[in-house]
C-alpha cells in the first residue's frame, strides 16, 4: 500500500514537471523578416527605440521588406484643481506599423498605449517620471509589434 502511494506520487511529480510550461516570450522564433529599407515618420526617437527592440535583420538586397513606422506621443492634461493647476496627466503613444513588399502593403496595424498619472510638485522628478512612463509604453508596444510581425 505504501509503495503504491510512493509510485503514484513519483508518477504525479513527473507528469507535473513535464507539463510543457514555458514563458510566452521564450517560444518566439527569431524573426525571418529581413528589412532592406526603413522609413520613420513622427517622433524619430520613439521609432528608433521601437526598431531596436523588435530585433529585425537589416539587409542590403531588395529581396526584403520595407518597414514604415509612424509614431506619435501626446501628453494631455486630464484634470486641474480649482486654481487651474494641472493635477493629472495622460501620456499616449501611438505607432502605426506597415510592412511593404514590392510596393504592396503586406501587414499594417496601429498600436496605442496610454497611462494616467498624477502631477508632481518637483518638475525635474515629473520629467524623469514621464520618461520612465514613455519607456514602459514603448516596451509594451514593441512586444505587441514583435508578436504581430511573427
List where the protein language model places each region.
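Bacterial signal peptide processing site
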Residues: 20-22
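Bacterial N-terminal signal peptides that target proteins for export
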Residues: 1-8
Amino acid at each position: 500500500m505504501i509503495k503504491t502511494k510512493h509510485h503514484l506520487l513519483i508518477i504525479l511529480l513527473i507528469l507535473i514537471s513535464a507539463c510543457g510550461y514555458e514563458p510566452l516570450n521564450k517560444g518566439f522564433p527569431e524573426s525571418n523578416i529581413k528589412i532592406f529599407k526603413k522609413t520613420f515618420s513622427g517622433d524619430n526617437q520613439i521609432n528608433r527605440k521601437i526598431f531596436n527592440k523588435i530585433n529585425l535583420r537589416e539587409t542590403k538586397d531588395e529581396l526584403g521588406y520595407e518597414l514604415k513606422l509612424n509614431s506619435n506621443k501626446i501628453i494631455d492634461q486630464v484634470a486641474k484643481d480649482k486654481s487651474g493647476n494641472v493635477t493629472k496627466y495622460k501620456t499616449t503613444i501611438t505607432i502605426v506599423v506597415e510592412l511593404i513588399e514590392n510596393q504592396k502593403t503586406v501587414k499594417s496595424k496601429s498600436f496605442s498605449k496610454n497611462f494616467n498619472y498624477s502631477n508632481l510638485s518637483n518638475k525635474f522628478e515629473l520629467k524623469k517620471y514621464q520618461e520612465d512612463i514613455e519607456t514602459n509604453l514603448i516596451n509594451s508596444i514593441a512586444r505587441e509589434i514583435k508578436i504581430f510581425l511573427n
